Amino acid sequence: MYVVSTKQMLNNAQRGGYAVPAFNIHNLETMQVVVETAANLHAPVIIAGTPGTFTYAGTENLLALVSAMAKQYHHPLAIHLDHHTKFDDIAQKVRSGVRSVMIDASHLPFAQNISRVKEVVDFCHRFDVSVEAELGQLGGQEDDVQVNEADVFYTNPAQAREFAEATGIDSLAVAIGTAHGMYASAPALDFSRLENIRQWVNLPLVLHGASGLSTKDIQQTIKLGICKINVATELKNAFSQALKNYLTEHPEATDPRDYLQSAKSAMRDVVSKVIADCGCEGRA
C-alpha cells in the first residue's frame, strides 16, 4: 500500500532520531515537486493540506494524485489534514481515504480541547487513521485564521501528559516559540520547555511554523524529540517569487509548462534543504 498513515512514519523517526517533513501543497505542480524530490532522495515525507487547500483542489482529486504519484515512484506517501477544526469535515475526508489527521482545537480551553480531540480520535482510530493535536497556540496566520501575539501561549509540559493520555492521540504538536508565516527576525525557541515536554510525553512531537528556521534550530529540536516538521510559507514564497521573476523577465511567456518550471525549481531547492535538515534522506 502506497498511501499510508503517519503513525508508522513518525514512530520510525522517533526511534531513528530524525524528523519527517510535512510539506503543505496547493496544486499539481507543488505536489510534483515534493514527491519527485522525496523519491529521488529516498526520504519519507507527508503531503499536507489545510481546509482551504482541500476546498481549492478537491479532496478526491488530491487523493487520486497522491495515490498515482506514490505508485509511479514506488514511494509510500501520507496525505495529512493540516489544521482541520470541524468533525464532520474530518469524518468525510477520512471516509474518502485520508489516513492522517490534525484536529486543531488549541484555541479552546483545556477541557474542551480534550473533549473535541477525543471525539476525533475515537472516530479516526476505527479507520486506522492517525491523529495529531496541538496543545498551546502559535501566532501568525494559517489559512484564514489569524492568531494575535496576545493570544499565543506555550505548551505546558505537565498538561501535555494529561492531554496525551486523555485523548489517545498519536502525535502532539507543541508551541515553543515558532509561528506560522516567515520571521522578521530569528525566533527564540524555548528548548528547555521542549526537553521538559519530552520527559513528560513519549509520543512523537510535532513542530509547526518551521518556515525560515535555521538548520541549527531545526536539528536541535529533533534532538529534543521533534519527529515531524511542518513547512508551508517558505514553499509558497519560493514558488511565487521565482514565478514573478520569470514573468517579469519573459513578459511574452504564455505556456504554463514553461513558466512554471522556474517556480518548481525554486521550491525544489527548499524541499531538498528541509529534507537534509530533518536528517531523513535515505530513510524511506
Swiss-Prot record:
Annotated EC: 4.1.2.40
Binding sites annotated in the UniProt record for dihydroxyacetone phosphate: G181, G209, A210, S211, N230, V231, A232, T233
Keywords: Galactitol metabolism, Lyase, Metal-binding, Zinc
UniProt catalytic activity: D-tagatofuranose 1,6-bisphosphate = D-glyceraldehyde 3-phosphate + dihydroxyacetone phosphate
Listed GO CC annotations: cytosol
Annotated binding of Zn(2+), by residue: H83, H180, H208
Metabolic or biological pathway: Carbohydrate metabolism; D-tagatose 6-phosphate degradation; D-glyceraldehyde 3-phosphate and glycerone phosphate from D-tagatose 6-phosphate: step 2/2
Gene3D superfamilies per record: Aldolase class I
Family statement drawn from the similarity comment of this UniProt entry: Belongs to the class II fructose-bisphosphate aldolase family. TagBP aldolase GatY subfamily.
Function: Catalytic subunit of the tagatose-1,6-bisphosphate aldolase GatYZ, which catalyzes the reversible aldol condensation of dihydroxyacetone phosphate (DHAP or glycerone-phosphate) with glyceraldehyde 3-phosphate (G3P) to produce tagatose 1,6-bisphosphate (TBP). Requires GatZ subunit for full activity and stability. Is involved in the catabolism of galactitol.
HAMAP family: TagBP_aldolase_GatY
Subunit structure: Forms a complex with GatZ.
Name under which the protein is recorded: D-tagatose-1,6-bisphosphate aldolase subunit GatY
Organism: Shigella sonnei (strain Ss046)
GN (gene name): gatY
